[in-house]
């Protein structure tokens, strides 16, 4: 597939089009909290379809801003930002935990009542609670770019994995929202759960508590497992579409994008785990022996 063809496929959407076959579940939550619904999902979907590429624009501006602020901080002392950091991480932890609890009802109920194929290939009801939390998920990816600002302003090490992950997730999430990617049920749930652990860990650390090493190792393990599971889920959708010739609400172009992102994420997270917990531990144990 040539780049121009791939780009064209990324911009070809069938949702709400004239020949679109409805592939959504009809499940409705038994209870809605006030405002827990997307008003006019068709409007928002078409808006995403028209302007999803601006997620790339935002990502480019994000990279530029990183360089500008790093230059600004070059000869300045780091900011402490203890309390803003606690509030920031605490708010994102609370959001992720609530989102996990509310969103998980839809895929878990679908797995139990409708089976794996429909859960994998039929997207959630666009007028119900799961759609609201899917929409909130997309918006949260913009908010989470703020994580990087705390790292730079506090002059902490900024690794490639961090900013690549933030930018790539934003782009993929917005595109998936534009085409109602059904497997997003799994992608979103995994990310919400991982972030529930991650931001809770960050909040406690920002408060000054020193947690055992196994806690951070567990968080990284969950994140790495999420990426490997993402590769597996994407491969299953590809198999359903190409080998079994069954309909599935996820375009081939979006699948290719998912493969690239999840494979690179898996590699980078494994590398990070090895460097942070295996090589580092090995060096520490050697230095202790030498002493």
From Swiss-Prot:
Transmembrane regions listed in the UniProt entry: 46-66, 79-99, 254-274
GO BP annotations listed: fatty acid elongation, monounsaturated fatty acid; fatty acid elongation, polyunsaturated fatty acid; fatty acid elongation, saturated fatty acid; sphingolipid biosynthetic process; very long-chain fatty acid biosynthetic process
UniProt xrefs under InterPro entries: ELO_CS, ELO_fam
Pathway: Lipid metabolism; fatty acid biosynthesis
Membrane topology annotation: Multi-pass membrane protein
UniProt-listed Enzyme Commission number(s): 2.3.1.199
Primary location recorded for the protein, binned into one broad class: membrane
One Gene Ontology CC term in the entry: endoplasmic reticulum membrane
Pfam family, one: ELO
Compartments reported by the entry: Membrane
GO MF annotation terms: fatty acid elongase activity
Reaction equations catalysed: a very-long-chain acyl-CoA + malonyl-CoA + H(+) = a very-long-chain 3-oxoacyl-CoA + CO2 + CoA
Entry keywords, A to Z: Fatty acid biosynthesis, Fatty acid metabolism, Lipid biosynthesis, Lipid metabolism, Membrane, Transferase, Transmembrane, Transmembrane helix
Similarity field: Belongs to the ELO family.
Reported function: Could be implicated in synthesis of very long chain fatty acids.
Name of this chain's protein: Putative fatty acid elongase 4
Species: Caenorhabditis elegans
Gene name tied to this protein: elo-4
